[in-house]
Amino acid sequence: MCEMVFRGSAQIRGRLIPSGIEQINGGMKMKEWYGWMGTILRVDLTRGKITKEPLSEELTHNFLGGRGIASKILYDETGAETDPLGPDNRLIISTGPISGTLLLGTGRFIVTAKSPMHGHLGQASGGGAFGAEVKFAGYDHIVVQGRAKKPVYLWLHDGEVEIRDAQHLWGKDTWETGKLLREELGDRYIRSLCIGPAGENLANFACPMTDEEAVPSKTGTGAVMGSKNLKAIAIRGSQSVKVADPGRYVGIVRKWWEVIPKVPFTATLKNVGTPWLIKMFNKQYNLAIRNAQEVCRPEEEVSHFYGENFVPKYRIRDFACFACRLPCQKFVRIHDGPYAGEKGRRPEYG
């Protein structure tokens, strides 16, 4: 057995365990998944019903990753008549086959729903460590339907799933909600995806937030959570993601961990973070201003937003998402003026 555990700024835990293609269980052949955990969790908030179903090989072979499988589920289970803010819409949290392993970017996840912004397929990608924790809890996809009678949150922990009262959290912003969930559940390493007042009040552009650090920011999936009276999903797991050839996989990971920081684009991203993109987008006439009514401004009007012009001055330390070699996120502190001493995360862009 080969087991490798990484711990870092995002409490990284990727475990690689070799196993056979099939295993005998009670005299019957049972599929041994690699990459996938093999389970879809379903929650019907109207009925208070929780079910688990096996992930099918047909889905994994015919549709690409978490995004593709989620698109298929939404296509099959909703239609043109489905109200994006109605109980029949689906909220789908999805991971891919390498989520929760050691390769860069494997903490990411996809949120899928029929979008309240335009009534069509809505998908948003989030970072941090939430996606990896979904896998560690034993799931590839979480499909939520229905509407709870009162605010609730889901608590997933190593095979156990609870629908808990969230009335005391309703009205709280996302940062406070995450903090209160960690205190209530007694574990500072819990990962959560939650909404704030915008999602609760069904603003069609509302987005959920995870762990005060990552935002699946497109297509209004936060409003879909609010329409279901779902304040948050809290997760803690300790399971492992299996790969077929751990030695070869670790070799690939090591190669990328060495190469990626040396690429000019990624080196700049590491040093100043996503505000670096403002300069590039402005030159490309791709900088959305005033709700995209304008796409470019004179450099003297926007240069103070360029990452290289403010991040070095205020940066305290760097931190990264799960299993990432590019700590593009920065903690900053204001040194002077009326807000001197204030600190937090620097603005993201992109």
Model-assigned labels for residue ranges:
Residues 8, 20, 345-346:
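Intrinsic low-complexity/disordered segments
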Residues 7-13:
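Short, low-complexity, charge-dense intrinsically disordered segments
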Residues 29-125, 129-350:
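Intrinsically disordered, low-complexity segments enriched in small residues
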Residues 14-29:
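Short, Lys/Arg-enriched N-terminal segments with co-localized hydrophobic residues
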